[in-house]
Structure formats: C-alpha cells, structure tokens
C-alpha cells in the first residue's frame, strides 16, 4: 500500500439530512438550539464549580470535568453538521474527517468511563457515607479523571490508526452527518473485515464492562436507600438513581445498537437517528439530570448569574 493510493481521495461528502428545504431549516434550528443549550448548561456548571468554593468537592469536580467533556463531545460534530445544512458541496477534508472520527470515538469512550467514575462516587457517598471523605479524596478524584481521559483516547488509537491507513480510491460519499466507522470503512478499496472486527470488539468490551459496572453500582445504591424505613427512602431512591439511569439507558441503548450488536437491516435513516440520540440528545440532558436538579448546584448557579448581572450593570 503506497501513499499515493491513500491520498487518492482528498475529501468526503457528508450527505447529512437530505430533504425539502423547509424541513432542513426546522431541523437546523432545532439542532442549533440544542447545541446552544448544551454549551450554556455545561459552561454554567463549570463556572459554578470554579467560583463557588462550597462545590470544591469530588462529586462536583467530577461534574465539572464531565461538563467539559460534553462540550467537546458535541463540538466535534455539531458545528460541521450545522454548516453542512447550508453547504452546496457538503464536503469535509480527508484529514478533517479522520480528526472528527478520532475525537468522536475517543470522547465517547471517555464518557463511558466518566459515567463509571460518577456511579462509583454515588455508590461511596450513599452506601459508605462515613468512609466517603477518606476514600474519595481530591488526589483519587484527580487520578480517576486522568485515567478516564487516558483510556478514552488510547483505547481506540490502534484501530483508528489502521483505519486511517486504509486506501480510499473510489467513491467518497458518506450518507451520514458525521464520519462514522462503518460508512467510512465501506468506502475503502481494501478489505476491512479484520479491522472492523477489532474495532467493534474493543467497543463492545468497553461498553459492556462500563455498563455492567454502572448498573451494579446503582443497584447497590437502590438497595441501600430502600432500606430506609420510610417513604422518603423511595423518593430518595427515585431522585438519586431513576433520572440518572434514564440518561445512562438512553446513551448505552443507542451505542449498543450501533457498535455492540449492529443490525445490518436497519435503514440509513435509523442509523442517523440512533447516532443523533447519543451524540446530541444525551449531552443536552446531562446538565439537567446530573446537576441542574441539584439544590446546591442551583444555588451556586443563581449566584453566578446574579454576579454576571452586577458586572454587566457596572
């Protein structure tokens, strides 16, 4: 395989969401609003944790790092998606496509491990409250955050490297709104079944391990909370775990359909919808579920926005 073969295709065409212009305008407006809300919600959480010293605890430090991750996760795909609505060519460069591909999967893998760490934090806080301060120290929190980023970006690095080396000498049209693994490898002029198998095997390993751990952690949390001899126990269980599990189920359900047990019979439109759920919908729900429903966080956000108003008036 020589370099001339690899560089034959210099750009790809992302078809995105073809359809009547009016429908595309509506779709563009919805995605833009969701993107703005995602950025605003997650940036507000980061500012609140940064400026309110009462939130300088492992739980909120994890939330701030998770919000930082979500900002980059949506930003690596949504801006290009929005530009493509008004682009006549809808092209993305070869290097741009693989850069997006690399960051999309690396950040997605990082999110899986972040959800694990956050589940572990909730497990310690609720099931072992007396030992929580001595176990979940600032040092351990920093180590766990670093490991999430490290594993997330190294986990698929070998597979992505070999996919990047594939020759692309023929068609360059991707019927998707981002550079996803299966549509991308389908355009290669070389056999891809081994690389595809390795990529999906690694994805399945990460997804299944983290999902089982998260479900196990929340099961133990539910069991502990429900042992409280009052109706408040049920309410606390639902408040603590129910909403978290809704987002986790939505995220993991979508990525499992795509990368653990993909169904060849699914239409392209269905693949786009599933990808849209875990790449755009869940990031906008996370600020609401994990932070904005929290009393301490809402109090801190109130002071942050009040401070911004005072600065603007002055």
Curated annotation (Swiss-Prot):
GO terms for cellular component: plasma membrane. Keywords: Cell membrane, Disulfide bond, G-protein coupled receptor, Glycoprotein, Membrane, Olfaction, Receptor, Sensory transduction, Transducer, Transmembrane, Transmembrane helix. Residues 46-57, 119-142, 223-244, 293-314 are cytoplasmic. Gene3D superfamilies: Rhodopsin 7-helix transmembrane proteins. It holds the Pfam family 7tm_4. Odorant receptor. Activated by isovaleric acid. This is Olfactory receptor 11H7.
């Amino acid at each position: 395989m020589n370099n001339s073969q690899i560089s034959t295709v210099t750009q790809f065409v992302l078809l995105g969401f073809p359809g009547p212009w009016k429908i595309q305008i509506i779709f563009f407006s919805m995605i833009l609003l969701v993107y703005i809300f995602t950025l605003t919600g997650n940036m507000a959480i980061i500012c609140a944790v940064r400026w309110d010293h009462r939130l300088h605890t492992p739980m909120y430090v994890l939330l701030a790092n998770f919000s930082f991750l979500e900002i980059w996760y949506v930003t690596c795909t949504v801006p290009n998606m929005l530009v493509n609505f008004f682009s006549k060519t809808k092209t993305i460069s070869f290097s741009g496509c693989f850069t997006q591909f690399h960051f999309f999967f690396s950040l997605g893998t990082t999110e899986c491990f972040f959800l694990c760490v956050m589940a572990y934090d909730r497990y310690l806080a609720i099931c072992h409250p007396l030992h929580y301060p001595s176990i979940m120290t600032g040092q351990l929190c920093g180590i766990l955050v670093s490991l999430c980023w490290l594993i997330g970006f190294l986990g698929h690095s070998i597979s992505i490297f070999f996919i990047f080396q594939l020759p692309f000498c023929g068609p360059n049209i991707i019927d998707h709104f981002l550079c996803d693994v299966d549509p991308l490898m389908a355009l290669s002029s070389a056999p891809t079944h081994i690389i595809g198998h390795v990529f999906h095997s690694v994805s399945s390993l990460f997804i299944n391990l983290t999902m089982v751990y998260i479900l196990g952690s929340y099961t133990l949390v539910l069991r502990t909370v429900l042992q409280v001899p009052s109706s408040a126990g049920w309410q606390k269980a639902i408040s603590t775990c129910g909403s978290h599990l809704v987002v986790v189920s939505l995220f993991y359900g979508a990525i499992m359909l795509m990368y653990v047990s993909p169904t060849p019979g699914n239409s392209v439109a269905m693949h786009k919808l599933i990808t849209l759920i875990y790449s755009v919908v869940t990031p906008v729900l996370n600020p609401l579920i994990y932070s904005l429903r929290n009393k301490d966080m809402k109090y801190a956000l109130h002071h942050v926005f009040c401070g911004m108003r005072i600065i603007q008036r002055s």
